[in-house]
């Protein structure tokens, strides 16, 4: 469970308004990533694929994350299944545990909703990165609940290298 300062950082981050930083960059990125995502998850309808990519770009950039790192994390967490539920109850694309809804103060949020799930996941990861003094490996392990072990971060990095980086 998060401590009080983490809880407050998360609430502050989620309350901010966010949008694309650079429209041209976003359009180029969306086209490239859409082709890659269609190869990786061909059953996702095109409109849902674009929504997933737009939300990933929007919240990753807004929270200071690499959008492709977020895509690699989503691949490892749910294999792009927005309705995925893990054996421990984590939900959606970024496998968010339901307790986060109460921590954030929005108990009625739908974690299967693409935007909600990606917004939560990006906010949580960005705070872990901040807490870990920008050590992304440790932050990824914290995100997964496997702090101190390298298996999960290495899976994310492998997906990032193989499919999401040029």
Predicted regions and their residues:
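Catalytic glycan-binding domains that act on GlcNAc-containing polysaccharides
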Residues: 7-9, 14-166
